[in-house]
């Protein structure tokens, strides 16, 4: 399958243009999307995947957060627990509304792309994934986490989480979070 990166990039830009890029949160997600796509391609190249698969990994990065824009418009937050699953919203926009065809005509990779987008923010991937799908899910998840770590270091808390640094520092840590931390477990909300 041949992926036209210019077409996909234009489709994403056209979609994002419906949202206010002057808003720091919208701009953050536009920039994040392009960085994640580039990181996906870089990871795929480092694994010596064929060029078509490098392009497919890149496309998964372009697609993964399209639901964030509508989440932000409706709820003014990036926090899924306070709104909706942005991954599920991305799947709805792309596959339920058919916007995936704006990015590519060939439906041959739809199942893989849908799965990668759907599971990119989940705590764990389903065990039943085939090896190829699991690989693309892992590439996208790794690229997304790499850039999110960068965002959390470089971007003020107020721009991301609707809370001031001072308020966050004053807020208590619950016993459940402390227990998970000391037990070296993931803190789930």
Predicted region positions:
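Divalent metal-dependent phosphate-bond-processing catalytic cores, especially two-metal-ion Mg2+/Mn2+ enzymes
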Residues: 2-3, 25-30, 34, 38, ...
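All-alpha prenyltransferase/terpene-synthase fold signal
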Residues: 9-24, 45, 98-99, 104-108, ...
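Active-site flanking loop/helix segments enriched in acidic
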Residues: 9-35, 67-80
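An active-site-proximal "capping" alpha-helix that borders the catalytic cofactor pocket
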Residues: 35-43, 84-99
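Acidic/histidine metal-binding catalytic segments
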Residues: 48-59, 100-118, 132-139
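His-Asp-centered metal-binding catalytic motifs of divalent-metal-dependent phosphohydrolases/nucleases
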Residues: 54-79, 90, 111-123
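Post-HEXXH active-site segment of zinc metalloproteases
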Residues: 73-88, 158-162
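Short acidic (Asp/Glu) patches
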Residues: 96-102, 121-128
């Amino acid at each position: 399958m041949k992926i036209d990166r210019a077409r996909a990039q234009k489709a994403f830009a056209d979609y994002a243009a419906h949202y206010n890029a002057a808003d720091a949160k919208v701009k953050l997600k536009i920039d994040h999307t392009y960085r994640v796509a580039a990181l996906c391609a870089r990871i795929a190249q480092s694994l010596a995947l064929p060029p078509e698969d490098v392009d497919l990994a890149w496309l998964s990065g372009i697609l993964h957060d399209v639901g964030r824009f509508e989440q932000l418009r409706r709820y003014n937050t990036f926090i899924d627990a306070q709104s909706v699953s942005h991954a599920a919203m991305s799947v709805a926009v792309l596959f339920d509304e058919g916007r995936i065809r704006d990015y590519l005509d060939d439906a041959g990779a739809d199942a893989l792309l849908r799965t990668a987008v759907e599971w990119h923010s989940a705590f764990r991937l389903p065990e039943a994934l085939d090896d190829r799908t699991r690989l693309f899910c892992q590439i996208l998840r790794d690229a997304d986490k790499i850039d999110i770590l960068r965002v959390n270091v470089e971007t003020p808390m107020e721009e991301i989480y609707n809370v001031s640094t001072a308020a966050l520092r004053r807020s208590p840590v619950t016993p459940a979070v402390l227990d998970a931390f000391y037990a070296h477990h993931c803190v789930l909300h």
